[in-house]
Each structure stands twice: as structure tokens, then as C-alpha cells.
Amino acid sequence: MKHSVHFGAGNIGRGFIGEILFKNGFHIDFVDVNNQIIHALNEKGKYEIEIAQKGQSRIEVTNVAGINSKEHPEQVIEAIQKTDIITTAIGPNILPFIAELLAKGIEARRVAGNTQVLDVMACENMIGGSQFLYQEVKKYLSPEGLTFADNYIGFPNAAVDRIVPAQSHEDSLFVVVEPFNEWVVETKRLKNPDLRLKDVHYEEDLEPFIERKLFSVNSGHATSAYIGAHYGAKTILEALQNPNIKSRIESVLAEIRSLLIAKWNFDKKELENYHKVIIERFENPFIVDEVSRVARTPIRKLGYNERFIRPIRELKELSLSYKNLLKTVGYAFDYRDVNDEESIRLGELLAKQSVKDVVIQVTGLDDQELIEQIVEYI
């Protein structure tokens, strides 16, 4: 049986990446620091996924195990030494924390003389996630390890898309996911092009597809959350049931379309249909997606290369409209949740400093005109 190592045994790891790896005939070693999840994986060796649609079908994922990377790093290194593929779904901010362990696993492959080519795919909501991870891993590699990695270890970027809401069940491994999923991998950085996963798309140039996803799904989802929170909605479905909010989301997506068409020459009709499907996904009555989950970490989401500021910057450069995106940024700066550290910190920054200084600090912008435009909406 083929072997995989997946970092992140959370809902997305189990409910999306785990399903695809299982359907492709892999044994999956889930690596995490959540002892409850790891123990359950080892005790049961399987878990169930429910598809949130009429009929609510279930998929049983088997041939799984768990490794606690904090308690047993040596087991992770051993797993990396023999594995056929490595994936992650841990969040962009956590990638640097697994870099040293990955590097040790790569060094172990080198010492063992394992020259089987291996690809490491960061399945995260970020542009260039796998290459970002590679830059972190390189810090811990010996010169020999670096040469070995360059020859035998690939870090192809990936774009992933599936809504997996926050949830709690008596069975800690059970997870509910939406029917839709999309996983796209760039081929130009693959070290093992012969290993093609079914239900995964492969593209020579990933950038148009990852931007289409991030600027459409992530920007649209976050827009739903921040505007929804402003109007008191508790779930994304509740937000979309408000015609005013839905209209604003559609206006944001129209601006995103203008950018994607101008930049990547996407077909207008196909992109309109893609955005129509996104709205339908947000309106799935079988998904309870809390606004608080989608809106969390606003400081990160207001970053220079993130889902709002990057498309705004690029639209401005192209002299295209971005007024609705600006309004959403204003709502994001105003968002507060006592359970979200970043939203509280954002409020503290705005209380202590001028709005302009906070905008510069959070967004990383130096375009004075754009900074002033954002300030107007806060």
C-alpha cells in the first residue's frame, strides 16, 4: 500500500485531504499535536465523513494512524523517511513550525539512501504555500541535505477549496463537509510526475487558478462574514439570506471578475458561472458555518498579499473599480469578537494610534492615496 504523511489532523485534513488520499489507496499517517485526535485515530484506525447535501451520504476513511509530533518527533521522521507523498493542512502561520521536522525527515531519507522522488504539498489558503514551506525547510538542511532535496524532493504549490465549517461531535473524528471540492497542483515543480492523484487537477501554471480561488472564494467568504457580522448575522447562510448583504457580496465578486479577466484572460461567462456556484455553496442549508469562524484573524486577512488588499492594489494599478472591496475592508477593520485575539488587538491598535497608522501597520501599504481611501471607510 502507498504511504502518505499528512500534517494537520483537523477538520480540513480529515474531511478533505484525507478523503482524497484514501480514495487514491494511501495509508495516511496524520501528524498533529492534538492528543485526543491522535489517540482516536490510533484506537479506531478509521473515521467517517458526512457530505452536507440532500441524503447526507457518508464515506468511511480507513487505513489511518496518528503521530503526536510533540511527543514522538522520531516517529514523524521515520514516517517521512519511507513515505510516498507529504501534504499539509495546518494553516499558513503554522508552516514554519513543521519545517525543522520536515528537514530532519529529508536528512533521514538522504542517510538511508532513499532516492525515491517525493513531493511535499502545502494545501493551505495562501499563494505559493509549498515554496514558502521549502524556504523554511532549507534553513534546517545541511549542505548535503540541500543538494539531496534539490534532486529528489519537490515542493509544488497547490490550491485547495472546500468549505469545512467549525463543528463539534461526540465522535471527535467525525466531520461534515460540503459536496464541492477542488485541489489543483502545479506540474512544473513536481518531482514525481508519475504519481497523479485522481480527483486532483494538475496545471502547468497554478497562479491563475490559485488567484481565482483566493480572490473569489476566500475574498467572497470573508466579505460574507464581515458584512454579515456588521448586520448581526451569526452564520454565513443567515448573512446570504439578507438581500442587502448578498447584493454586496455579488458586487465584490464583480470587481474580482474584472481583475481576473484583465490579468489572466478568464472567460467572462465561465467566471460568472464559477462565482454563481460560490454563492450557492455559501447558501448550502446543510452547512452551519459560523460567521466567527470565517471572520477570525482579521489582521492576517488584511495583509498586503491577502484576499482584500492584493486585489485592491492590482485593480488600482489597472484603473478598475474596487469601491466595494474598500467597503468590505472597512467592515473588517471594525470587526470585533471577544474570542478572537486578532480582532481584539485590532481594536486596541485603533484605540491607541491614528487610523492611518494602523492601516499602514496592518496592510503594509505605502500608497498614500490608497491608504487614505481605506481610512475613509473605517
UniProtKB/Swiss-Prot annotation:
NCBIfam families per UniProt: PRK02318.1-3, PRK02318.2-5
Top-level division of the source organism's lineage: Bacteria
Name this polypeptide is given: Mannitol-1-phosphate 5-dehydrogenase
Species, as recorded: Streptococcus pneumoniae (strain CGSP14)
UniProt record, GO biological process: mannitol catabolic process
Keyword Nucleotide-binding: no
GO cellular component, one term: cytosol
Keyword RNA-binding: no
